[in-house]
């Protein structure tokens, strides 16, 4: 008898149908003790059409780790996709895609228009596993481009926040 293979949700998504930038609710899981964890797709650029260079993505990652934590109750983690088109956001509890999209927009606005190198946390050899691979300039330019397109609370229809 063949074993059922695990299903990876993001591999089931038709990446040709989505319209980035967007926030997409992926799933909520309930742990053994009733704890609820939600997973969101924060897609910043259109899949298979573009990818954020690693230095810029790395800097966005470090900076939104602080900015989203301040804006989303129950923030757990925000990790980049290997394809470099966005991030997975994990939170305790559930949040609307509109609320997450607003928090993301505010965070990207800060990076694009206000952030200085002092606002990028953990950029030393002691605090980062690849401290040489950061670019605030690249992060700012990509954030401006993403914001110009607008952040949607829906992956398939443009519902800008």
From Swiss-Prot:
<dbReference type="Pfam" id="PF02664">
    <property type="entry name" value="LuxS"/>
</dbReference>
<feature type="binding site">
    <location>
        <position position="62"/>
    </location>
    <ligand>
        <name>Fe cation</name>
    </ligand>
</feature>
<keyword id="KW-0456">Lyase</keyword>
<keyword id="KW-0071">Autoinducer synthesis</keyword>
<dbReference type="GO" id="GO:0009372">
    <property type="term" value="P:quorum sensing"/>
</dbReference>
<keyword id="KW-0479">Metal-binding</keyword>
<dbReference type="GO" id="GO:0005506">
    <property type="term" value="F:iron ion binding"/>
</dbReference>
<comment type="function">
    <text>Involved in the synthesis of autoinducer 2 (AI-2) which is secreted by bacteria and is used to communicate both the cell density and the metabolic potential of the environment. The regulation of gene expression in response to changes in cell density is called quorum sensing. Catalyzes the transformation of S-ribosylhomocysteine (RHC) to homocysteine (HC) and 4,5-dihydroxy-2,3-pentadione (DPD).</text>
</comment>
<feature type="binding site">
    <location>
        <position position="128"/>
    </location>
    <ligand>
        <name>Fe cation</name>
    </ligand>
</feature>
<dbReference type="InterPro" id="IPR011249">
    <property type="entry name" value="Metalloenz_LuxS/M16"/>
</dbReference>
<keyword id="KW-0673">Quorum sensing</keyword>
<dbReference type="InterPro" id="IPR037005">
    <property type="entry name" value="LuxS_sf"/>
</dbReference>
<comment type="subunit">
    <text>Homodimer.</text>
</comment>
<dbReference type="GO" id="GO:0043768">
    <property type="term" value="F:S-ribosylhomocysteine lyase activity"/>
</dbReference>
<comment type="similarity">
    <text>Belongs to the LuxS family.</text>
</comment>
<keyword id="KW-0408">Iron</keyword>
<dbReference type="InterPro" id="IPR003815">
    <property type="entry name" value="S-ribosylhomocysteinase"/>
</dbReference>
<feature type="binding site">
    <location>
        <position position="58"/>
    </location>
    <ligand>
        <name>Fe cation</name>
    </ligand>
</feature>
<protein>
    <recommendedName>
        <fullName>S-ribosylhomocysteine lyase</fullName>
        <ecNumber>4.4.1.21</ecNumber>
    </recommendedName>
</protein>
């Amino acid at each position: 008898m063949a074993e059922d293979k695990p299903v990876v949700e993001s591999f089931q998504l038709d990446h040709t149908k989505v319209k980035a930038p967007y926030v997409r609710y992926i799933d909520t899981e309930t742990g053994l003790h009733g704890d609820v964890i939600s997973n969101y797709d924060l897609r910043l650029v259109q899949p298979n059409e573009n990818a954020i260079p690693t230095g810029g993505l790395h800097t966005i990652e470090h900076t939104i780790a602080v900015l989203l934590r301040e804006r989303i109750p129950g923030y757990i983690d925000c990790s980049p996709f290997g394809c470099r088109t966005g991030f997975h956001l994990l939170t305790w509890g559930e949040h609307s895609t509109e609320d997450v999209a607003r928090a993301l927009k505010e965070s990207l606005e800060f990076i694009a228009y206000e952030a200085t190198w002092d606002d990028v946390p953990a950029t030393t050899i002691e605090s980062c596993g690849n401290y040489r691979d950061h670019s605030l300039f690249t992060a700012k330019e990509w954030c401006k481009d993403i914001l110009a397109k607008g952040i949607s609370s829906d992956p398939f229809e443009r519902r800008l926040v």
